[in-house]
Amino acid sequence: MNPIVINRLQRKLGYTFNHQELLQQALTHRSASSKHNERLEFLGDSILSFVIANALYHRFPRVDEGDMSRMRATLVRGNTLAELAREFDLGECLRLGPGELKSGGFRRESILADTVEALIGGVFLDSNIQTVEQLILNWYKTRLDEISPGDKQKDPKTRLQEYLQGRHLPLPSYLVVQVRGEAHDQEFTIHCQVSGLSEPVVGTGSSRRKAEQAAAEQALKKLELE
């Protein structure tokens, strides 16, 4: 991989790996090599959840568990991680197999989100929990400063349903229109039909649930509720 690109990525991350092989593995999708990033992703997912939960616990001493859970879900969900990945220009650094390259995997939200989690796992193994915690807090500083308890933190499907129910409109319908990839690495495409919108909105995700949430979020944007 181009060392100039890698060095630029590490500057954007705010961390230089002592063991570059961990960085290479974190950037490697299953389609490219047997030494891929899924174990690092598993580790990073748990670390991210802990760090964000800990930050919210101390920032909001009077907020109940339900609101903290919703805020955490907002901060660690796939599209938030994909936003971070785009801020890092992560797509240009991914190691993908020929099929994923051809289908635009470097832009796919689920792959970008998974790679951010893998990088977190890699940084932890390369350093320690204190270092990776501070790094995550640096990445999330603006988002943590801006987030607040309340209805806005409910997941998109819940907010869309409550909006429609409040206006005595039919509930949205979700239809799976495409499933791509093998069992271990699928991408679902969902059409969401909503009263008040002339055409279905589209959502994609690595599971049906995530795709439905993505579609609901797009519907909320079209209804100008986001």
From Swiss-Prot:
Domain RNase III: from-to ranges: 6-128
Note whether Ubl conjugation occurs among the keywords: no
**Phenotype when inactivated?**
Accumulation of full-length 23S rRNA as well as larger precursor rRNA transcripts. Strain grows slower than wild-type.
Which terms under GO biological process does the entry name?
A: mRNA processing; regulation of gene expression; RNA processing; rRNA processing; tRNA processing
Q: What cofactor does this protein call for?
A: Mg(2+)
State its location(s): Cytoplasm
Q: Name one GO molecular function term.
A: rRNA binding
- What are the positions of the active site? 45, 117
EC code: 3.1.26.3
InterPro entries per the UniProt record, alphabetical: dsRBD_dom, RNase_III, RNase_III_dom, RNase_III_sf
- Write out the entry's keywords from A to Z: Cytoplasm, Endonuclease, Hydrolase, Magnesium, Metal-binding, mRNA processing, Nuclease, RNA-binding, rRNA processing, rRNA-binding, tRNA processing
Q: Which PANTHER family match?
A: RIBONUCLEASE 3 (PTHR11207:SF0), RIBONUCLEASE III (PTHR11207)
Tell me more from the record: This organism contains small helical (90-110 nucleotide) intervening sequences (IVSs) in all 7 23S rRNA genes at either the 550-bp or 1170-bp positions or both, accumulating the 23S rRNA as 2.4, 1.7, 1.6, 0.7, and 0.5 kb pieces.
Put simply, this protein is called: Ribonuclease 3
Q: What is the lineage of its organism?
A: Bacteria, Pseudomonadati, Pseudomonadota, Gammaproteobacteria, Enterobacterales
